[in-house]
Amino acid sequence: MTNIRKTHPLMKIVNNAFIDLPAPSNISSWWNFGSLLGICLILQILTGLFLAMHYTADTATAFSSVTHICRDVNYGWIIRYMHANGASMFFICLFMHVGRGLYYGSYTFLETWNVGVILPFATMATAFMGYVLPWGQMSFWGATVITNLLSAIPYIGTDLVEWIWGGFSVDKATLTRFFAFHFILPFIIAALAMVHLLFLHETGSNNPTGTSSDMDKIPFHPYYTIKDILGVLLLILTLMLLVLFAPDLLGDPDNYTPANPLNTPPHIKPEWYFLFAYAILRSIPNKLGGVLALVLSILILVLMPLLHMSKQRSMMFRPISQCLFWILVADLLTLTWIGGQPVEHPYIIIGQLASIMYFTLILVLMPIASTIENNLLKW
């Protein structure tokens, strides 16, 4: 008798994706972040659903409805903080996942990679709109500043901004539509993630050496299901430590003040996971130039397959490229720090140097290093 999990139309899909999937025998813990992102997404959708049951998307009541969730709803505070800090965990996993892809040359799976580049954009849009919903000071001013960037687009910029706002400033219409988009986007992200997996399973996973693992495959279950569960436990442990002991560690105190269009906060800054891009935006004195640099800072990932000059796929056996990769990581941490600092000396010049460094490393130095490594091996 044939096994139902291999014959049933629905079970067959699950079986081929998570049970009998042939996986490389040597993939390290850096390959855990895909499943962790899936867990994060499910967690965000569930906590978000329960928050939406008590939230009102209206400028007059949004702030007080969030207060009501925290004070009066049974375990509302834990749901709210799990959702807020869950976003931070989501981005930590996202950065690790992309970093893994860059280090081990996973971007050579073109379709998987290109769908994967769309995912951070969708996630960032979702997180930005979610940050606006509590209608605190940083929500309002963050929404005003970031949506205003679109006015840098020639000819249509101003009309576009007013169209997004639904008026002449960030107001009730803006909040309502942001709530609608914030609700729908995670489901679009889930659909894109399924397409991402579909393309990945066409080729099979990469592995740390970057060589073909067709001759040495093991079933996904039980080996990687167990390995993923360890990752999930560590993720939940970290999340709950944040939620229960330091729920506001990564937030902004300004967001505990209700939105006031007549009072601008001294330092307008986004959540920590946008700071690197915000620093790049601020480092260019021209508005349109800054917006282009901001978009390119993430869109540059699309160019990675074109910039790959090495005869080897992975950086595992390429020490010069490894050094440049870790310099890039340090540079991104520097940009994250600068993005949270006020616009004054010496932060301005540090931000500009770090921004130049970021693009130079990716567009110039890493391809040169790859070519040098090829020559050293007489390839």
Swiss-Prot record:
Keywords: Electron transport, Heme, Iron, Membrane, Metal-binding, Mitochondrion, Mitochondrion inner membrane, Respiratory chain, Transmembrane, Transmembrane helix, Transport, Ubiquinone
Positions that bind heme b b566: H97, H196
Note on cofactor: Binds 2 heme b groups non-covalently.
GO molecular function term, any single one: metal ion binding
UniProt: heme b b562 binding residues: H83, H182
Keyword Iron-sulfur listed: no
Entries under InterPro entries matching the protein: Cyt_b/b6_C, Cyt_b/b6_C_sf, Cyt_b/b6_N, Cytb/b6-like_sf, Cytochrome_b, Cytochrome_b_C_euk/bac, Cytochrome_b_N_euk/bac, Di-haem_cyt_TM
Cofactor: heme b
Its membrane topology: Multi-pass membrane protein
GO cellular component annotations of the record: mitochondrial inner membrane; respiratory chain complex III
Binding site for a ubiquinone: H201
Compartments (UniProt record): Mitochondrion inner membrane
Primary subcellular site in the record, as a coarse category: mitochondrion
Transmembrane segments: 33-53, 77-98, 113-133, 178-198, 226-246, 288-308, 320-340, 347-367
Record text on subunit structure and interactions: The cytochrome bc1 complex contains 11 subunits: 3 respiratory subunits (MT-CYB, CYC1 and UQCRFS1), 2 core proteins (UQCRC1 and UQCRC2) and 6 low-molecular weight proteins (UQCRH/QCR6, UQCRB/QCR7, UQCRQ/QCR8, UQCR10/QCR9, UQCR11/QCR10 and a cleavage product of UQCRFS1). This cytochrome bc1 complex then forms a dimer.
Additional remark text: Heme 1 (or BL or b562) is low-potential and absorbs at about 562 nm, and heme 2 (or BH or b566) is high-potential and absorbs at about 566 nm.
Family listed: Belongs to the cytochrome b family.
PANTHER family in the cross-refs: CYTOCHROME B
Cited function: Component of the ubiquinol-cytochrome c reductase complex (complex III or cytochrome b-c1 complex) that is part of the mitochondrial respiratory chain. The b-c1 complex mediates electron transfer from ubiquinol to cytochrome c. Contributes to the generation of a proton gradient across the mitochondrial membrane that is then used for ATP synthesis.
Name of the protein: Cytochrome b
